[in-house]
From Swiss-Prot:
TM region(s), chain numbering: none
Top-tier EC class: ligase
Binding sites annotated in the UniProt record for ATP: 273
Originating gene: cysS
Protein name: Cysteine--tRNA ligase
Species whose genome carries this gene: Chlamydia trachomatis serovar D (strain ATCC VR-885 / DSM 19411 / UW-3/Cx)
Length: 477
């Protein structure tokens, strides 16, 4: 099935036709000056969904996510704490990887650290100087001359002639009102940089943020990538500058598909520490929410729409996951009779799967996929309530254990994309299932003493039986 993705460069949905196998995917990772906040994780979960969909559709993927461990913010933090850059960044790097695990975000194939690629960055800067697209300024920093790159502004759709140009800027982050030559190498300033610098042919200093991503991606993925993803705030200047640097170095198109997720708002306001609406994942975990609940909330909206984050939304995510958990537990009930997979159940499963996948291939429309999932759950629950398969005029077969197992297999399949379904109950060993069946047989003939003995035997194997109006459930203790 063809995959269509919205390409920021063309402003159109395009059929995904990778030029590489495996697909070369680069995503902007954290700047490790602080704990990542939920706005960051909205982007990381969108990128995780993208990767999972590619894998689900049968593509091989080689994924690189960078770690920015040298920039204005990390240097300021290290200087304030009076420690080395590595010592300052390390706790935030560890926390980031722990957060990825909590949110069920698949690991990248490589996590390059900017500080490990300084020699390659220096070499690239020298190459750009030799080509005449970079120059040493009066402040001894090295700048990229945007006038030497005719396609500058194509990604962010800027008309350079209509914008006010400044001479140059050495800040890592700036807005479109300050369009100017950007820094490739920042000359050493002892008051600003303390003891942190690298030697180079241009003098002591450190690389600019934009150059770091270009060199790490080229070093690990080559000169032409299939997909580069990030947040909309990265379009300008960061990704615009990446294109200028990378294509000046290689003289080849840098990226085929650019994908960007929209902003996350908190109570319809921009997240900021001054407004008191700034949350890290740890803040939410401390409030009693789970990683799955946070993931579900950040996952459920389309990535190109603003997502409004609220406490009510988190509680709604909790209820959605409870509904999913209850459905899965119901399917795991071992009391269903042995029988065939009924054609009506198989047809319902196939119809749902086709809708689920079709939505995903339409620019990762996860909202429609989730709507299809809950509609499917409603239909299956209704059929179980009626003690039948999906009813037709000619077939009213009893819902079977095989029906349940077929649906569970389908849910496990789609969870390769969602990464959030609460399969809380592990596989039940065959010997425990045998004891459960023996207990059910004893109960049917009202041999309560034997039924109790078998219950105790099941308990001794760390499983419990819950008898309810809708049947019996087995749970791991």
């Amino acid at each position: 099935m063809d995959l269509f993705l919205y390409n920021t460069l063309s402003r159109e949905k395009e059929r995904f036709l990778p030029v590489n196998d495996p697909v070369k995917l680069y995503t902007c990772g954290p700047t490790v000056y602080d704990y990542a906040h939920i706005g960051n994780f909205r982007t990381y979960i969108f990128e995780d969904l993208l990767k999972r969909v590619l894998l689900f559709l049968g593509y091989s993927v080689y994924h690189v996510m960078n770690i920015t461990d040298v920039d204005d913010k990390t240097l300021a933090g290290a200087r304030k704490k009076g420690c080395s850059l590595e010592k300052y960044c390390q706790p935030y790097i560890h926390a980031f990887f722990a957060d990825l695990e909590t949110l069920h975000i698949l690991k990248a194939d490589a996590y390059p650290h900017a500080t490990h690629y300084i020699p390659q960055m220096i070499e690239a800067i020298q190459q750009l100087i030799n080509q005449g697209v970079a120059y040493i300024g009066q402040d001894q920093s090295v700048y990229f001359s945007i006038s030497q790159f005719p396609n500058y502004g194509a990604l962010s759709h800027l008309n350079l002639e209509e914008l006010r140009n400044s001479a140059r800027i050495d800040a890592d982050e700036y807005d479109k009102d300050n369009l100017c030559d950007f820094v490739l190498w920042k000359a050493y300033d002892p008051d600003r940089d303390g003891e942190i610098f690298w030697e180079s042919p241009f003098g002591k200093g450190r690389p600019g943020w934009h150059l770091e991503c270009s060199i790490m991606s080229i070093s690990l993925l080559g000169q032409s990538l299939d997909i580069h993803a990030g947040g909309v705030d990265n379009i300008f200047p960061h990704h615009e500058n990446e294109i200028a640097q990378s294509e000046s170095l290689s003289h080849k198109p840098f990226v085929r598909y650019w994908l960007h997720s929209h902003h996350l708002l908190v109570d319809r306001k921009k997240m900021s520490k001054s407004l008191g609406n700034f949350f890290t994942l740890r803040d939410l975990l401390d409030q009693g929410f789970s990683g799955e609940e946070v993931r579900y909330l950040l996952l459920q909206g389309h990535y190109r729409t603003q997502l409004n984050f609220t406490q009510e939304g988190l509680h709604a995510s909790r209820q959605s996951l409870k509904r999913l958990r209850d459905f899965i537990c119901r399917l795991e009930d071992p009391s269903y009779p042995d029988d065939i997979i009924h054609p009506e159940v198989a047809t319902a499963c196939q119809s749902f799967l086709e809708t689920f996948i079709t939505s995903l291939t339409n620019d990762l429309n996860i909202s429609s996929s989730l709507a299809a999932l809950f509609d499917f759950i409603r239909k299956i629950n209704s059929s179980i309530d009626q003690h039948t398969g999906i009813q037709t005029e000619t077939d009213s077969s009893v819902f079977s254990k095989q029906d349940a197992q077929h649906i569970l297999a389908l849910l496990r399949k789609i969870d390769q994309v969602l990464g959030v379904l609460p399969f809380s109950q592990p596989d039940i060993p065959e010997e425990v299932l045998l004891l459960v069946e023996q207990r059910e047989a004893a109960r049917k003939v009202k041999n309560w003493q034997e039924a109790d003995r078998l219950r105790d035997e099941i308990l001794s194997r760390s499983f419990a039986i819950e008898d309810g109006k809708t049947g019996m459930k087995v749970k791991k203790l």
